[in-house]
Amino acid sequence: MKKLPGSVFICTVACAALATMPLRAADAPQKNWTPPAQKIYAQKLSDETMAAHPELLSITLHGVPPGQANVYTMFAGSYPERIGNPDDPDDIDVSKKGITIIDPRWHRTNDTTKKFVVLMPMRDKSGENIGLVVYAFKNPENPNTSAAEKEYLAKATALRDSLAQKIATYKALFDPAK
């Protein structure tokens, strides 16, 4: 009979742990793509961009991985834990329609870091739209101006055009990094 209180305690702890498991699983986004074990060329480009541009908070590359159909995902970027996360509807719009979104995020309550985000079509060396590139810049001093929007659009365009010169084809982004 002396074992009963200990057994009840163990059972209570186990039940509490099991009860919170679905909540933890719900917090993590469901991945729609798994990257290969080795670093891909796209990740190398992302790493090089971040190293060369301290004004950036992040860069992410999005699109449909080769061999997939309508699986829009982040496949490289400065947030490795997000690789394989499904794209949001606005990400897909940029990829499909070739539009650019200028998103000054200095008033968002969910973002802990103030930033200026530009979502734009990613291009290859030939100028073909091949997906989405997202640049998040450190917050400008005067973010509420059209001059800030023009400045960040110009910076993002220059970065994107420079990146395009390093992309022979979309498929090459998924080749092993050298």
Model-flagged regions — what are they?
Residues 1-11:
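Bacterial N-terminal signal peptides that target proteins for export
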Residues 47-69, 161, 165-173:
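Short N-terminal helix-loop-first-beta-strand/juxtamembrane motif that initiates sensory/input modules
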Residues 131-132:
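Short glycine-/small-residue motifs
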Residues 112-121:
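A short beta-strand signature within small-molecule sensing/ligand-binding domains used
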Residues 10-20:
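Bacterial N-terminal signal peptides
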Residues 21-25:
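Sec/Tat signal peptide C-region and signal peptidase I cleavage site
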Residues 40-42, 77-107:
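Extracytoplasmic/periplasmic sensor domains and loops in membrane signaling proteins
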